[in-house]
UniProtKB/Swiss-Prot annotation:
Native source species: Bacillus anthracis
Domain SLH: from-to ranges: 29-85, 86-149, 150-210
PROSITE patterns found in the cross-reference section: SLH
EC number of this enzyme: 3.5.1.-
Subcellular location, record wording: Secreted, Cell wall, S-layer
Protein name, per record: Uncharacterized cell wall amidase pXO2-42/BXB0045/GBAA_pXO2_0045
GO cellular component terms, semicolon-separated: extracellular region; outer membrane-bounded periplasmic space; S-layer
Chief location category: secreted
Length: 531
């Protein structure tokens, strides 16, 4: 064994880290480095106030590579984590490493997870994808991303770090390298400082990023009758400042903060109708159209503005010959969709994706299906930003309170499981009490659970863990048929991979949607038009 070589490597690693990081109190006198590239200067200056130092000769050596142990130490220092000099991480290859206390600190904080085989590889140079992973976990950046982002760099497509890098790009933390993103590229000292400083400087920003994958219109207020603020916007990544339970989001535009709906309003016109360029019968007739389902982009009294192949046109609903009104029980019915956790509560940690974003994305997809296909109103108990309530216990009460306040007809809570990495499968719960003092809809809840469970098993092709009785607050305290479904285990490789996929989450949403329709069929209503 070449012990001299090993000692030399360890010494070099410790030296690099100590040169990169030093206690803030040693930086009383401001230093400047002559070799820092312009693009990294602001970041270097920023971290010098926290924990950054240079070489003994007064240089910074920006092109020097940084290893994983040094990166862990830098993250621990910038995050202000408590360092126990005696602490050991769980990784076998890092227990006796010079950076062991720092690796233990960032592991405890949930910033790192190792390579999946029980090792951390602390002396290995860190690549850009791994650096992105540290930043996303350390600053909970996934909580600032709504839905799925497009991959803008060709060299990221199919790479395990694509989703992580996409988040950094969308949040303005990274712009790539000029000729790609280079996820396997080794991080230099300058790049490490740039990554960390840019992320830390933006930590007070609570806005979200979302890719709007269709043309969209903005409005003055969260209402189609509030007035259109501009022509259609092309599909793009948008900055979201607020999201409401009814599907409206406040976004940043070049003319200030405006509103747009997550889902376009669809309305079925049952008779022949005439369209106009303005909301006035005195304006020119543009055309006559056969009965069809239209997209409504604006409302003004009895008039609605719709999208046609020839552009936006107005029609007067008062002129329509309405079909004989049927007794449609769906009108006015509200379905409460409850995506579990949220905000600071990420739920179970997943191999690929944590519970909270999985269930929120699935819930939004369910809501969209109801908005597009039925007269139902589907409301979410939380937005993408936070969980309701002051703490976990209060959050449960707020969810039930929301359901009651909005006169929910049924309540469906969506979760994902986690245990030890080996457990897998799908299960759905309902509440059954020895007395009827709590939720009295035991039989309805059971049938609803059975219908949703059956659809999910078929759609997700997961192990059927069954329909179970659960003494869960949101089921017990509700005053409507209520169920809680666990889609799968995010910490299981097979289940987690499915739940990480937008396509599989769409399958889950469609299964929940169909299961709810099945429930209403069981209740004696003809739902065939809505499947």
């Amino acid at each position: 064994m070449n012990t001299k070589g090993i000692i030399a490597k360890l010494t070099a690693g410790a030296l690099i880290a100590n040169l990169l990081i030093c206690p803030a109190n040693t930086l009383a006198e401001k230093k400047t480095f002559t070799d820092v590239p312009n693009w990294a200067q602001q970041s270097v200056n920023y971290l010098m106030k926290k924990a950054l130092d240079g070489k003994p000769d007064g240089t910074f050596s920006p092109s020097e590579k940084i290893d994983r142990g040094s990166a862990a130490k830098l993250m621990a220092m910038v995050l202000g984590l408590q360092i126990n000099k005696q602490a050991k991480p769980s990784f076998q290859d890092a227990k006796n490493h010079w950076a062991s206390p720092y690796i233990a600190a960032v592991e405890k904080a949930g910033v790192i997870y190792g390579d999946g085989s029980g090792n951390f590889n602390p002396s290995k140079d860190i690549d850009r994808a791994s650096m992105a992973s540290m930043l996303v976990e350390a600053y909970k950046l996934n909580n600032r991303i709504i839905g799925d982002l497009p991959t803008q760099f060709e060299d990221l497509k199919g790479h395990w770090g694509a989703k992580l890098a996409n988040a950094l790009v969308a949040l303005g933390i990274s712009k790539g390298t000029g000729d790609g993103w280079k996820p396997n590229g080794i991080v230099t000292r300058a790049e490490a400082v740039q990554f960390i400083a840019q992320t830390d400087m933006k930590k007070a920003d609570t806005s979200k990023r979302m890719y709007m994958n269709r043309h969209f219109i903005t409005y003055h207020q969260p209402s189609l009758s509030s007035g259109v603020t501009s022509n259609q916007h092309a599909p793009q990544i948008i900055v979201v400042k607020e999201q409401r339970a009814d599907g409206w989001i406040k976004i940043v535009t070049n003319i200030g903060d405006k509103w747009t709906p997550l889902y376009e309003k669809r309305e079925t016109i049952h008779s022949t109708f005439t369209t106009y360029p303005e909301a006035s019968h005195s304006s020119k007739v543009l055309g006559t159209h056969s009965p069809q389902t239209v997209t409504v982009i604006e409302e003004k009294g009895s008039w609605i503005r719709i999208r046609t192949n020839a552009g936006f046109q107005w029609l007067d609903k008062n002129q329509l010959t309405l079909p004989k009104k049927q007794n449609n029980f769906l009108e006015g019915k509200t379905i409460i969709i409850d995506p579990g956790h949220g905000g600071i509560d990420g739920g179970h940690k997943g191999i690929y994706m944590n519970e909270s974003p999985v269930v929120y994305d699935t819930a939004v997809r369910v809501q969209k299906l109801f908005a597009q296909k039925t007269p139902f109103t589907a409301l979410l108990t939380r937005d993408a930003y936070s969980r309701p309530g002051k703490n976990a216990t209060d959050s449960l009460g707020k969810r039930v309170e929301f359901a009651k306040k909005n006169k929910g007809d049924i309540f469906v809570s969506i979760h994902a499981n986690g245990f030890n990495g080996n457990a897998h499968g799908t299960e759905t719960f309902y509440y059954k009490a020895p007395t009827q003092k709590s939720n009295p809809y035991v039989n309805d809840s059971r049938i609803l659970a059975e219908k949703i469970q059956k659809r999910l098993i078929t759609a997700l092709q997961t192990r059927d863990r069954g329909v179970k009785i659960g003494n869960l607050y949101v089921l017990r305290e509700n005053t409507m048929p209520s169920v809680l479904t666990e889609l799968g285990f995010v910490d299981n490789k097979a289940d987690g991979k499915k739940l990480d996929s937008p396509e599989w989450r769409q399958r889950a949403a469609e299964a929940i949607y169909a299961g709810i329709l099945d429930y209403y069929e069981w209740k004696g209503h003809n739902m065939s038009a809505y499947y």
